[in-house]
């Protein structure tokens, strides 16, 4: 089984200690991104996985490529010489809490278009994993996402769609319409309970999962935070799946 994960990654600066960002003397440099996080997790489980996106031809872009490859992820990227890799700053105002600021306007990832995709690799993959973040970044990234889904649908590649709503990027109404369009062409849909309500208008997990299935996918997973998830797959209600406990890292 091979997987392609499509979506933007960002350079990440994390405050080295708890406190207001302007009072923290040092920050740790890394990177983050919903789709590349999935890619890393799969690679650690031994699954062949490719991360596909567009990066700035800069130090952050090179850092992201290098660290992904160090994790065993194949990076199918194109480099933009005129746009930067996006950046996010993460502060820890109190123990157990965090706040994130994004600097992604005009980023290389926001300039992604269908021409930057390795369509052949998508067609050859078993699974294409996407999120709603890509659709929110602009017309070019949305067109790229649509082209990737078209290629997957045409070749029998399973489409995994995690809603991953970002309210800072677009309005609820615009997002909900786009999510329904994408979900209708996906095979598996993941959504938090608040995202599932945005997508379907339903409030209970079982009703949310059923309404997602009605859009077209065969599997729906409604994420319930510490309580786990509610899953509906191929007509069978798997019901509540317990969550696993963890700790901040």
For every predicted segment, state its role:
Residues 1-3, 150-154, 201-249:
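Conserved phosphate-binding/catalytic region of the ribokinase-like
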Residues 48-132, 157:
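Conserved N-terminal subdomain of the carbohydrate kinase-like
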Residues 140-155, 177-185:
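Catalytic-core regions built around general acid/base machinery
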């Amino acid at each position: 089984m091979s997987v392609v994960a499509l979506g933007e990654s960002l350079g990440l600066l994390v405050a080295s200690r708890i406190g207001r960002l302007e009072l923290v003397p040092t920050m740790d440099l890394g990177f983050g991104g919903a789709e590349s996080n999935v890619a890393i997790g799969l690679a650690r489980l031994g699954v062949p996985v490719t991360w596909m996106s567009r990066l700035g031809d800069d130090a952050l872009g090179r850092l992201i490529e290098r660290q992904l490859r160090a994790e065993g992820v194949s990076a199918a990227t194109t480099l933009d010489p005129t746009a930067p890799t996006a950046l996010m700053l993460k502060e820890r105002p109190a123990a157990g809490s965090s706040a994130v600021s994004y600097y992604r306007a005009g980023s290389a990832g926001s300039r992604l278009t269908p021409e930057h995709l390795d369509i052949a690799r998508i067609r050859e993959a078993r699974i294409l994993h996407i999120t709603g973040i890509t659709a929110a970044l602009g017309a070019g990234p949305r067109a790229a996402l649509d082209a990737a889904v078209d290629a997957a649908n045409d070749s029998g590649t399973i489409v995994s769609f995690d809603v991953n709503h970002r309210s800072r990027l677009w309005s609820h109404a615009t997002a909900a319409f786009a999510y329904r369009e994408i979900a209708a062409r996906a095979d598996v849909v993941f959504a938090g309970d608040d995202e599932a309500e945005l997508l379907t208008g339903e409030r209970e997990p079982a009703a949310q999962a059923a309404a997602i299935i009605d859009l077209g996918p065969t599997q729906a997973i409604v994420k319930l935070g510490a309580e786990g998830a509610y899953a509906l797959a191929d007509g069978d209600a798997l019901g509540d799946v317990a969550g696993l406990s963890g700790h901040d890292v």
